């Protein structure tokens, strides 16, 4: 009988290099078991086919997971022109094959131009978006007729990395909610031949622009070699780099952590990251135009050292 895993409180962010073939939740649970972390969450799903950066939040860091979900991201995508699939990627069943037209670099740039900026995009029917409280992919697997939602997304840049028919390599920088599978599908239709994603890798997620990622295999190896789990996590403040910062003295930090509002004309307005005098993050707050700081999310237990 396998020994029961004893979980412990860990607080911080792991920059996981997700492998292909694993769902984001399964990747999270695998990392959580290796770290023996009590609580964990990810910051937005990567398709099972995709590899690359999946920030995982543990303990008190789960309180900022939703904020990272809305961050800008960048991907490298390999697209196969001429074949459409039911999932819009290589994991799906082929639906239709069409001839790929001769395409110059100018043709590709002209075809890509309408997909840059704020655009309307229909999500894939095989996606984790929920409809009636159920993921679309569950309905699709049952063969139900689905009208996937159309949403406005922000595609900031598309760079052509290479093209040799039928394979096109792109680097895409985009905002939250953008489906690269949908981008490939719609680009294929614009070219008159259809397309799907052959491979996809997420390069970075704001604010982790140059991430030092770790694979599940490497994580397992360093833990087996005796590394302390907490030392493998980035501190919570690493995920707060894009927020205005307020440092409070000990008395006001204690009041903030008790949920009390504070007022100071010098506070920057908007959402802020609040720290105590020793640099430990106390939480997130919102400062109004009158300098009133209201607590939004409070971090607890960050100075506690977990048992090994």
Curated annotation (Swiss-Prot):
The active site is at 47 (nucleophile). GO terms for molecular function: RNA binding; tRNA pseudouridine(55) synthase activity. Its EC number is 5.4.99.25. It is an enzyme of class 5 (isomerase). The keyword Isomerase applies. Transmembrane segments: none annotated. Pfam families: TruB-C_2 (PF09157), TruB_C_2 (PF16198), TruB_N (PF01509). GO terms for biological process: mRNA pseudouridine synthesis; tRNA pseudouridine synthesis. It catalyses: uridine(55) in tRNA = pseudouridine(55) in tRNA. Gene3D superfamilies: Pseudouridine synthase, PUA domain. Belongs to the pseudouridine synthase TruB family. Type 1 subfamily. Responsible for synthesis of pseudouridine from uracil-55 in the psi GC loop of transfer RNAs. This is tRNA pseudouridine synthase B. The lineage of its organism: Bacteria, Pseudomonadati, Pseudomonadota, Gammaproteobacteria, Lysobacterales.
């Amino acid at each position: 009988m396998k020994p029961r895993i004893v979980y412990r409180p860990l607080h911080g962010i792991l920059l996981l290099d997700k492998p292909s073939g694993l769902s984001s939740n399964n990747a999270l649970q695998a990392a959580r078991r290796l770290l023996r972390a009590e609580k964990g969450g990810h910051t937005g799903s990567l398709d099972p086919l995709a590899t690359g950066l999946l920030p995982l939040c543990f303990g008190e860091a789960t309180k900022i997971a939703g904020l990272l979900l809305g961050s800008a991201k960048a991907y490298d995508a390999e697209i196969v022109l001429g074949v459409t699939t039911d999932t819009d990627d290589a994991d799906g069943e082929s639906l239709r094959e069409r001839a790929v037209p001769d395409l110059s670099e100018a043709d590709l740039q002209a075809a890509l131009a309408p997909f840059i900026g704020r655009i309307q995009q229909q999500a894939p029917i095989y996606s984790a978006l929920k409809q009636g409280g159920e993921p679309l992919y569950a309905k699709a697997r049952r063969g139900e007729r689905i009208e996937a939602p159309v949403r406005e997304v922000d595609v900031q840049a598309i760079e052509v990395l290479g093209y040799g028919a039928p394979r096109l390599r792109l680097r895409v920088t985009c905002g939250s909610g953008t489906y690269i599978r949908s981008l490939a599908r719609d680009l294929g239709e614009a070219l008159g031949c259809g397309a799907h994603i052959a491979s996809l890798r997420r390069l970075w997620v704001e604010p982790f622009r140059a991430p030092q990622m770790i694979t599940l295999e490497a994580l397992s190896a360093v833990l087996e070699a005796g590394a302390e789990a907490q030392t493998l996590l980035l501190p919570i403040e690493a995920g707060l780099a894009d927020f205005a910062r307020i440092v409070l003295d000990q008395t006001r930090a204690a009041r903030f952590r008790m949920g009390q509002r504070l007022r100071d004309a010098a506070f920057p307005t908007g959402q802020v990251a609040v720290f105590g005098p020793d640099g430990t993050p106390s939480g997130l707050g919102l400062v109004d135009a009158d300098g009133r700081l209201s607590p939004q999310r409070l971090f607890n237990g960050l100075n506690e050292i977990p048992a090994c």
